[in-house]
UniProtKB/Swiss-Prot annotation:
Keyword field contains Metal-binding: no
Residues involved in NADP(+) binding: 168-170, 195, 236
Gene3D superfamilies: Leucine Dehydrogenase, chain A, domain 1 (3.40.50.10860), NAD(P)-binding Rossmann-like Domain (3.40.50.720)
Signal peptide: none
Keyword Repeat: no
One Pfam family matching this protein: THF_DHG_CYH
GO terms under cellular component: cytosol
Record key words, sorted: Amino-acid biosynthesis, Histidine biosynthesis, Hydrolase, Methionine biosynthesis, Multifunctional enzyme, NADP, One-carbon metabolism, Oxidoreductase, Purine biosynthesis
Protein name per Swiss-Prot or TrEMBL: Bifunctional protein FolD
GO terms for biological process, alphabetical: L-histidine biosynthetic process; methionine biosynthetic process; purine nucleotide biosynthetic process; tetrahydrofolate interconversion
Organism: Mycolicibacterium gilvum (strain PYR-GCK) (Mycobacterium gilvum (strain PYR-GCK))
Family: Belongs to the tetrahydrofolate dehydrogenase/cyclohydrolase family.
Length: 286
């Protein structure tokens, strides 16, 4: 009932299209004796992290990528985590891998991520690869920003010349998305908004595209959106009742031209481009 006005940016259908392409590419790699492998490092018993990792390995099975799991207890030392990362760096069966976050508080997340071999960085978030993105050099791209750009293009939302308001400056979405969108291949103008941004509604009402990645429930309301604009909902948080909700209020569907559902919008593409990064790495090694 709330989705009458806007076209749905359907991430699930778009993911399925990507999977068809990946299956064909993985089959060619397998025929050449180079089946790619995705590894995950999971520390502790967080139910959300376990569910997310299960989903990643289920995706691997769908396209023919080998799965490698390293599940570790919550009380491991930094040294044991480092040894696990070093083992995957040296493992020829592992084309790319991720360290599932968050880690237990006694472990140094930044040190763990920096220890990953940048060429095996499936998330595209190693400092070296983010630096290559700044320089517009080839490197694994951050999965969620790449998924956002792909989703907009898939539904023919004009990016070149568009004013994009990005809400949130996190390292996984906001900051790298601004870098992607301002490349010559995208040619957007980006306003990166955060907690100290003044006059936010005025900024968003001027935007052709809004990407909400702040993690604030329903912060983007209908009065903040220019009629016909595209709105991408990336944020995930819980409301007062404990229900998972996005950053975009349901009323936005009556005003915007395109809206991504949450869930079912960007999330499926984040996982799809995790696999894409691994396949691209395997193809580069042929």
């Amino acid at each position: 009932m709330m989705r009458v006005g806007a076209i749905t940016l359907d991430g699930k259908a778009t993911r399925d299209e990507i999977f068809v392409d990946l299956r064909e590419r993985v089959a060619r790699l397998a025929a050449a004796g180079r089946t790619p492998g995705l590894a995950t490092v999971l520390v502790g018993d967080d139910p959300g992290s376990h569910a997310y990792v299960r989903g990643k390995h289920a995706d691997c099975a769908k396209v023919g990528i080998n799965s490698i799991r390293r599940d570790l207890p919550a009380d491991i030392s930094q040294a044991v985590l480092d040894e696990t990362i070093d083992e995957l760096n040296a493992n020829p069966e592992c084309t790319g891998y991720i360290v599932q976050l968050p880690l237990p508080k006694h472990l140094n997340e930044n040190a763990a991520l920096e220890r990953i071999d940048p060429s095996k960085d499936a998330d595209g978030l190693h400092p070296t690869n983010l630096g290559r993105l700044v320089l517009n050099e080839p490197a694994p791209l951050p999965c969620t920003p790449r998924g956002i750009v792909h989703l907009l293009r898939r539904f023919e939302v004009e990016i070149a010349g568009a004013h994009v308001a990005v809400l949130g400056r996190g390292v996984t979405v906001g900051r790298p998305l601004g870098l992607l969108l301002t490349r010559r291949s995208e040619n957007a103008t980006v306003t990166l908004c955060h907690t100290a941004t003044r006059h936010l509604p005025e900024i968003t009402r001027e935007a052709d595209i809004i990407v909400a990645a702040a993690g604030v429930p329903h912060m983007v309301t209908a009065d903040m959106v220019r009629p016909g604009a595209a709105v991408v909902d990336v944020g995930v948080s819980r409301d007062d009742a404990g229900k998972l909700v996005g950053d975009v209020h349901p009323g936005v569907w009556d005003v915007a031209g395109h809206v991504s559902p949450n869930p079912g919008g960007v999330g499926p593409l984040t996982r799809a481009f995790l696999l894409t990064n691994v396949v691209e790495r395997a193809e580069a090694n042929l």
